[in-house]
A protein has these predicted regions:
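Multi-pass alpha-helical transmembrane bundles in non-GPCR membrane proteins
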Residues: 1-223
Length: 223
């Protein structure tokens, strides 16, 4: 094989189906970057900027990969980089929670599991052995510590975290349906399940941003 991520799937340069909105949703989302930077400037937390970097990388790579035309070798690399960026974004979205809300012992346990799932999924990505379950285990790490989140988050942060999980989970379902060849509406020439996945990730990113912003601007409970 030529190292493609999904062995039985065509590349875009080989004629893979691509609705008009494919990639453009994530690319357009970058216009909100100045607003995001403005609000987190009220925080001295480096971890919130780390989360913002993850957002820029994830949506930037996704937007460029899906929107523009690439040579076969470049597209193969961009495809894996796209999935790698999603994994890193998932890590960065939870890092502020670990450093601002969790006590040291809990933080160490959380980061150990989180980084282990990230490394495992990264290896699977670059060796062309992708797994939705393995990828989902990265954000799933936070569910193991939901009791700690409940204990240390305020009501708005808790609600935003649940909404982020709801949107990301629904997006994952849409992504799986897209990979299995299901069509959302007719031939999906404009908008399909993969675009629904991209839309859901934007809502998830917004609610995660709100969680990280609010915990960063208030006094950390566990320095």
């Amino acid at each position: 094989m030529d190292g493609r991520l999904f062995k039985d799937e065509l590349l875009y340069c080989e004629g893979k189906h691509k609705p008009w909105f494919r990639g453009k949703i994530h690319l357009a989302s970058l216009v909100f970057l100045p607003v995001a930077v403005y609000y987190i400037s009220f925080s001295n937390s480096p971890w919130v900027y780390f989360n913002l970097f993850g957002n820029i990388l994830c949506f930037g790579v996704s937007g460029f990969y899906h929107t523009f035309e690439w040579s076969p070798s470049t597209e193969l690399f961009m495809q894996k980089l796209d999935h790698q960026a999603i994994s890193l974004w998932t890590v960065t979205m939870m890092t502020p929670i670990a450093f601002h809300l969790f006590p040291t012992e809990t933080r160490v346990k959380f980061l150990t599991i989180l980084l282990s799932t990230f490394i495992a999924n990264s290896y699977a990505t670059w060796t062309s052995q992708p797994s939705t379950i393995l990828a989902s285990s990265i954000p799933g790490t936070l569910l193991l510590f939901s009791g700690e989140c409940w204990k240390h988050m305020d009501s708005m942060e808790w609600t935003c975290m649940l909404l982020a999980f709801a949107f990301q989970s629904s997006g994952t379902v849409a992504y799986v349906l897209s990979n299995k060849g299901y069509r959302l509406c007719g031939n999906d020439t404009i908008y399909g399940y993969h675009e629904l996945f991209h839309t859901a990730t934007l809502f998830a990113a917004y609610f995660v941003y709100m969680v990280n912003y609010t915990i960063a601007v208030r006094e950390p409970r566990f320095p």
